[in-house]
Amino acid sequence: MTSLSDILASSAEAGLSLQRSDGSMPAGHNGPYHDPETPVRNTSHWLVTFLKAHELTDENRFRQAASDAVSYLLSEEARPHGHTFEHRQNDTKDRCNGLMGQAWSLEALALAARALDNERAAAVAADVFLSHPFCDKLKLWQRVDTDGTILGFDRTFNHQLWFAASGGLVAHTAPQEVSQRVRDFLDSLPSTIDLYENGLIRHPLRPSMDLSELAESVTHDVHRSMVRNHLLHYLRPPRSKRRLRNKAEGYHSFNLYALAILAREFPSHSVWSTDLLSDILEYTLSEEFREATTDNKFSHPYNPPGFEVPAAMETFSVGSYKEREMWVNEQIQHSFDPNTSLLTRGTDDKQTHAARLYEATRLDDYEIYLD
């Protein structure tokens, strides 16, 4: 028997030998999407783990590793045009990985800015966040590619949610405008989030719009993409709808984790006392959800529900300690390799999954039962 803090420290130790001289960490391929990625994403994740390892052990080598990771994220290689972070190099997709890629890097820089008292990290994080156009009407952000090109709304809900969560972290050392945009997003969350009948969060972004708003949006260059999502909601064939539901089941815990971050940063916001959140949490605690995460390629092998669900349970004070501990142990049993101290089992993207242990840094220190 060991503890989660021991797992984090030992994995950070293993991570030290993976870090390159420029501070970067090995790149993966975005899990099931198989996108050629730059080191930016995994360096962002490992940065958080190194910070946690320093907090746990007070060993300077972890602080230095975190500092080196920050240096890489602030380098020209990570932001080649001085705009957004370059996360992937797939010629058929954007290089910023929508809002999602930026959220991961902003999350890491925001935490490092405070832990390392790094003013440049704070300034860059605020600058990149605010460079993304925010729609005052829909309370949503547009994507900005690495060369500064504005690409329109990110039409995936979890990307918008995670970008808001990263903004909540950035807000600690940023202009008031950052916090205000996140609060505006939270104010509109009940009309932005879309649920299945059982409380499962839908994957596509489909904000509530009446017929007049939809008609008006058709003539608006930026808003038109939201009309597309509304049309697709009704026109998708059954097979496509089943695939999307399976994806939503694999991403439900990922959404929960972002909601938990936001709730910790804005604990008094009224959205946390709505029926909306109650419905989401009720589904999360159901046996139906547990079964849905089994053999789902977007779940344990990619998004780690064993860290994400307990984070939400802790934050919103639901479920028992034993249930949370069970989720954590299930993820460790599935993914942790005790021989390497890395989260590399049961996945075809070992580099990315190893980096995603960072999500456990926000959890209580649970007992871990290794085989």
UniProtKB/Swiss-Prot annotation:
| Localization terms from the record | Cytoplasm
What changing residue 38 to L does, per the record, is: Defects in N-glycosylation pathway
Give the record's pathway: Cell surface structure biogenesis; S-layer biogenesis
- Which keywords belong to this entry? Cytoplasm
- Can you supply one Gene Ontology CC term for this chain's record? cytoplasm
- Record region (Disordered): 19-39
What is any one GO biological process for this UniProt entry? S-layer organization
- Knockout consequence? Defects in N-glycosylation pathway, characterized by impaired addition of the fourth sugar of the pentasaccharide: both dolichol phosphate, the lipid carrier used in H.volcanii N-glycosylation, and modified S-layer glycoprotein Asn residues only present the first three subunits of the pentasaccharide.
Q: Is Cytoplasm among the key words of this record?
A: yes
Q: Which InterPro entries match?
A: 6-hairpin_glycosidase_sf
- Establish whether keyword rRNA processing is in the entry: no
Purpose of the protein: Putative isomerase involved in the N-glycosylation pathway. Required for the appearance of the methyl ester of hexuronic acid found at position four of the pentasaccharide N-linked to the S-layer glycoprotein. Either involved in preparing the third sugar for attachment of the fourth pentasaccharide subunit or processing the fourth sugar prior to its addition to the lipid-linked trisaccharide.
The protein here is known as Archaeal glycosylation protein Q
The organism named in the record is Haloferax volcanii (strain ATCC 29605 / DSM 3757 / JCM 8879 / NBRC 14742 / NCIMB 2012 / VKM B-1768 / DS2) (Halobacterium volcanii)
